[in-house]
Every structure is written in structure tokens, then in C-alpha cells.
Amino acid sequence: MRKLILGAILAGTSLFALGTQAESLSPADIKIGRQYVELPTHVPVAQPGKIEVVELFWYGCPHCYQFEPSINAWAGKLPEDVSFRRVPALFGGLWNIHGQLFLTLEAMGVEPKVHTAIFDAIHKDGKKLATPEEMAEFLAGHGIDKDAFLKAYGSFNVKSQMEKAKKLAIAYQISGVPVMVVNGKYRFDLGSAGGPENTLQVADYLIEQERSAQ
């Protein structure tokens, strides 16, 4: 299993294949240990008082890219008591490089502006975005100042956020992406849920469970 996980990471692919969308889930179908698991140690959320949903992802992951339209539409309709955030998975190599790209753009407050464009650049246009200079050149085409980006990319703040992301992935016990975690308690993925839409149904179910428990 360890070799399988390592192979998937080195290949830049997810362990959780999208496959064919399984039959739509009803709330009665969703069971702990089947569609989702409870983490043995609950992880503190970033915004206490809100129900937190985290997606762990990698820009280079094809399954994350295919999941994007569904999760973007879903996240855009979340109620006020739910917070959604993305966290890059950092497994070394390009994972870390792209994770640093994401965290830099997030620190600059411009990540939503270019999130989809970065996915498209990698998966449609074949760009690697493997160096800060290549990233800066690409981002300049989207109105982001090169020098400001390069300064932020190497900043202490971004490096600190990298360490936090690494620790979070360990706490969540993830081995591939995309993965979702609700309220620091429940982890699930495309494979366990049975496809993209079912994954979001599991998220909705767990959000409602957490809301009812408040």
C-alpha cells in the first residue's frame, strides 16, 4: 500500500479516481465508515463559530481539475454559517511548488482571480509552472505584478503557511487528493463517496449534521 501511495504521489495522480458517477445518494444511504470516516483526533477549525469545509488539492492533479466545476458551483451557494477554503497538499516536488504558488496568491488576495486559469494552464495548455519566474510571467498576463508576486513567493509569511498546510495534511491523515474535510472531524473523497456529485452530497449531509449538533 505504501508503494501504491508513493507511486501515485510521484506520478502526480490521485488515488481516488473519478470513475463513473455512482447512483445518487440519499441521506439514508450515507454511512460513517462507508462514504466518510471520522478522524481519530478532531482538528481545530480556522473560523470558530462556522461550519468549516476544507478541500485539499493540487493544481497538477487531473481529478482535482475535473472536480473544479462541481465544487466551484457548490461553494458559491453555501449559506453564511459555512466557510469553505482550499488547502494545498504538499507531498514534495511540484506539489510543494504549486502549493507555494497557491499560498502566495492567497496571501496577495488575488487567488480567486486566477485559480481556474492556473488549472487550465497546466491541464489544457501543458504549462508546468515549475519555477517562480515562469509563474510570474504567466500571472503577469492576468494583471498580477511580477515583482510583487516574486517578493511574496519568497516571504516568511508564505513559508509559514506552507508549514501549516503540511501539518494540516498530517492531522487529516491524507494520502492523495482531492479530499474534503468537514469541521475538522469527517474526511471523505471521490472514491469513498462515489463520484463528484455524491461527494458534495456527503458534504451537505455532514454540514447539516454539524448544524443540528450546535
Swiss-Prot record:
Residues 1-17 form the signal peptide. Disulfide bonds join C61-C64. Keywords: Disulfide bond, Periplasm, Redox-active center, Signal. It is found in: Periplasm. It comes from the Bacteria. This is Thiol:disulfide interchange protein DsbA. It holds the Pfam family DSBA. GO terms for molecular function: disulfide oxidoreductase activity. Involved in disulfide-bond formation. Acts by transferring its disulfide bond to other proteins. It comes from Azotobacter vinelandii. Gene3D superfamilies: Glutaredoxin. Belongs to the thioredoxin family. DsbA subfamily. Residues 18-208 form the Thioredoxin domain. GO terms for cellular component: periplasmic space. Its main location: periplasm. InterPro entries: DSBA-like_thioredoxin_dom, DsbA/DsbL, Thiol_disulfide_DsbA, Thioredoxin-like_sf, Thioredoxin_CS, Thioredoxin_domain.
